[in-house]
């Protein structure tokens, strides 16, 4: 199988978020701030997944063991993910628990599998940057420390 989206497509469910004000489970809680669908793809699930993880490790210079399971995320027309930070907020119960289990996130790598007809940009509001998605492109951004909201 050469397409990670086909591998996990049957498992797509409404995306969740980690929030300080509500109880969450391992995949977070549903929120109007994030209206996409997602599925987790564990390391070792297929040769393709392992190949993608190995390439991500080489690109980022992070060990494969430190890379989370891949997330397949699908945005239908009108879906969005409101401005947010990808790291876990250490001052919240859910953030502290996730950091204790798996450590703090230090970066995000997005691989674009499709070029949308419209929309789909990733915005970096503080830096006033906009990244438009295109099939085959990747976006890597890192955060050195948790940032006060």
Model-derived regions: residue spans:
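Fe(II)/2-oxoglutarate oxygenase catalytic core
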Residues: 1-149
């Amino acid at each position: 199988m050469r397409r990670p989206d086909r591998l996990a497509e049957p498992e797509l469910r409404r995306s969740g978020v980690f929030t300080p004000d509500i109880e969450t489970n391992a995949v977070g809680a549903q929120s109007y701030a994030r209206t996409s669908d997602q599925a987790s793809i564990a390391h070792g699930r297929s040769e393709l997944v392992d190949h993608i993880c190995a390439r991500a490790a080489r690109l980022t210079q992070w060990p494969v063991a430190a890379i989370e399971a891949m997330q397949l995320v699908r945005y239908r027309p009108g879906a969005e993910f409101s401005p947010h930070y990808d790291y876990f907020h250490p001052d919240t119960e859910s953030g502290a628990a996730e950091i204790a289990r798996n450590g703090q996130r230090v970066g995000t790598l997005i691989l674009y599998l499709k070029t949308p007809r419209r929309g789909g940009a990733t915005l970096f509001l503080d830096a006033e940057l906009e990244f438009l998605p295109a099939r085959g492109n990747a976006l890597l951004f890192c955060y050195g420390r948790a940032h006060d909201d």
